[in-house]
C-alpha cells in the first residue's frame, strides 16, 4: 500500500495551494490527501461563517485528527505555515509516520513576534477584538509577508484565492502567553517520529530565525533545511521544485524502511 501524505494548509488557504506538491508526490507513487480546515470551504469573495472567528487551533486539530484516523496507517503529515503547527500538534498525539514542516508557525514557548511578523498582521492586530472575528490580511500585507517573490500577476491570482481566517487561532499563535488554554502548546517529548523543518531565508511571516528554534525543539528527531533563495510561499514561488525535491529525498529512506 502506498504511503499517504496528508497535506494541511495554512492561514487563509485551502487544498488548492498543494497542487504543485500533489503533482510531484503523486508522480512518485504517494497517495496525497489535502485537508480543508473548518469554515475554509467558501467563496473568497463571500461572507465568512461567523463561527470561524472563534474557532481554536484545537478545533482545527480535532477535525484533522478525525480525518487522519480514517486513513488507516499513519500518514506523513505535511503542513505549511499554520498547517505546520497543526502537524506538530497531531504529531504529539502519535498520529504521524513523519512530519514535514514547511515554513511552519511556531508553538508556544517560542517568541515569534519579530518586527516583520508584527507588520505582516498590522491591520488585523490593531483592531480591538480581532481574536473573536474572522480576519484576513490586506493585499499589501500578503505581498510583504508571503508573496514578495512572486510576479505581480501571481500575487494577485494567489491573493484572490485567500479566504478569511480565525482571529482566535491567530491570537493563540501570536499571543500564546495570554492564552489560558495553551492551544498552541506541543510536548516535544511526544514527537518521536522523524521531523523535517524547512525555512526560507527571505521569509517575513515565519522568519528563519524562528523556524530554527522550531527545529531545535525537536532536535533529537529533526532535520533542518534553510533555502537561501526562498521566502514563505515555498509551495509555489520560483524554484519551488527544489524544495519539493529536497523533501522527496528526505522522505525516500523512510519510505524504503516502511
For each feature predicted by the language model, list its residue ranges.
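Gly/Ala-rich beta-loop-alpha elbow adjacent to hydrolase catalytic centers
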Residues: 78-83, 87
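Conserved alpha/beta-hydrolase "acid-adjacent" motif
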Residues: 204-210
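Conserved acidic catalytic loop of the alpha/beta-hydrolase fold
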Residues: 59-75
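Flexible "cap/lid" loop of the alpha/beta hydrolase fold
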Residues: 95-132, 169-178
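Catalytic active-site module of serine/aspartate enzymes centered on a nucleophile-bearing elbow/loop
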Residues: 221-258
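Conserved alpha/beta-hydrolase
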Residues: 26-48
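Short beta-strand/loop motif that positions the catalytic acidic residue
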Residues: 191, 197-199, 203
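Active-site glycine-rich loops that stabilize anionic/oxyanionic intermediates
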Residues: 10-13, 81, 201
Amino acid at each position: 500500500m502506498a504511503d499517504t501524505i496528508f497535506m494541511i494548509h495554512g492561514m487563509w488557504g485551502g487544498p488548492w495551494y498543494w497542487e504543485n506538491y500533489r503533482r510531484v508526490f503523486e508522480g512518485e507513487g504517494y497517495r496525497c490527501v489535502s485537508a480543508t480546515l473548518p469554515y475554509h470551504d467558501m467563496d473568497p469573495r463571500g461572507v465568512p461563517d461567523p463561527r470561524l472567528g472563534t474557532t481554536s487551533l484545537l478545533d482545527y486539530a480535532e477535525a484533522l485528527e478525525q480525518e487522519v484516523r480514517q486513513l488507516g496507517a499513519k500518514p506523513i503529515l505535511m503542513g505549511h505555515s499554520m498547517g505546520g503547527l497543526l502537524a506538530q500538534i497531531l504529531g504529539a498525539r502519535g498520529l504521524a509516520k513523519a512530519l514535514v514542516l514547511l515554513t511552519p508557525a511556531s508553538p508556544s514557548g517560542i517568541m515569534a513576534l519579530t518586527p516583520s511578523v508584527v507588520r505582516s498582521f498590522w491591520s488585523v492586530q490593531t483592531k480591538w477584538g480581532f481574536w473573536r472575528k474572522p480576519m484576513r490580511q490586506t493585499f499589501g500585507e500578503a505581498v510583504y509577508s508571503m508573496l514578495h517573490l512572486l510576479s505581480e500577476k501571481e500575487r494577485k491570482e494567489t491573493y484572490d484565492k485567500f479566504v478569511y481566517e480565525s482571529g482566535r487561532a491567530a491570537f493563540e499563535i501570536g499571543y500564546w502567553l495570554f492564552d489560558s488554554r495553551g492551544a498552541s502548546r506541543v510536548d516535544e517529548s511526544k514527537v518521536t517520529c522523524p521531523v523535517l523543518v524547512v525555512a526560507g531565508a527571505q521569509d517575513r511571516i515565519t522568519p528563519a530565525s524562528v523556524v530554527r528554534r522550531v527545529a531545535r525543539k525537536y532536535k533529537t528527531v529533526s532535520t533542518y533545511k534553510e533555502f537561501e533563495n526562498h521566502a514563505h510561499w515555498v509551495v509555489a514561488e520560483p524554484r519551488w521544485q527544489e524544495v519539493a525535491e529536497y523533501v522527496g529525498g528526505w522522505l525516500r529512506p523512510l519510505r524504503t524502511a516502511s
